[in-house]
A protein has these predicted regions:
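Fe(II)/2-oxoglutarate
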Residues: 1-38, 205-209
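Basic side chains
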Residues: 3, 68-71, 121, 189
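Compositionally biased, intrinsically disordered low-complexity segments
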Residues: 5-11, 18, 41-42, 88, ...
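Non-heme Fe(II)/2-oxoglutarate
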Residues: 22-110
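Catalytic core of non-heme Fe(II) oxygenases with the double-stranded beta-helix
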Residues: 99-209
């Protein structure tokens, strides 16, 4: 006869096996999250200008927010479906970013979803940089919207490589890969940033906690 305590342990193990997902294990437990890629000219200069311009109009009316992401907040505003550029951005994500991420990480593209998209502003008279951090999502992207600044770029802690993007270029990576926004010296740097979930909100954190 199986003892009750053994039965409980077997049930717990079975639950863990049922909940297990190799993608989550790779990203959260095994640290296999160092892959990244840069997609050249995913956005046109005209599209980038439209995002910046609409962001400027929105900020004049609502101001720039500085505390939306806790300890590692940026000066930003969330881009939502009330923005005229939303459909264009959403289409770029679903039709161009999702396939790249799915191929890079060998995952099911249909499980990817948008958690948040936001316009970030770094300026010489405001927030100049963002310290090393991990994003609260499985996958992330950064789109360079302008080049009217000196410095900047994104550095990943594991290899210390500073990735500089041209206008319209998009950096795709795992949000679990620790990275930082490098300090700008002059001007204003605008980026479009996005957090992408895999399998739904908190899907992986539940399975790896």
């Amino acid at each position: 006869m199986i003892r009750p305590i053994v039965l409980v342990l077997l049930c717990a193990l079975l639950i863990q096996l049922l909940l297990a997902d190799p993608v989550c294990d790779d990203l959260y437990i095994h640290g296999k999250n160092k892959k990244r890629t840069v997609v050249k000219s995913l956005f046109s200069e005209e599209e980038c200008s439209k995002i910046i311009n609409e962001g400027g109009v929105y900020a004049k009316k609502h101001t720039w927010l500085k505390n939306r992401h806790g300890r590692y907040s940026t000066t930003d505003n969330e881009v939502t479906d009330t923005w005229s550029v939303w459909d264009m951005i959403k289409n770029k994500i679903s039709k161009m970013m999702y396939p790249k991420i799915a191929k890079m990480y060998n995952i099911n593209q249909s499980k990817l979803g948008i958690k948040e998209v936001f316009l970030v502003k770094y300026s010489e008279n405001g927030q100049r940089k963002l310290e090393y951090h991990k994003d609260g999502c499985e996958f992330s992207f950064i789109v360079a919207l302008n080049d009217h600044f000196q410095g900047g770029g994104t550095t990943f802690k594991h290899d210390q490589k500073n990735i500089q993007l041209r206008i319209g270029d998009t950096l795709l990576f795992s949000g679990r890969n620790e990275h930082k926004g490098n300090e700008i010296a002059l001007g204003t740097r605008y980026i479009l940033a996005g957090f992408l979930n895999y399998g739904g909100n908190h899907y992986c954190t539940i399975r790896t906690s």
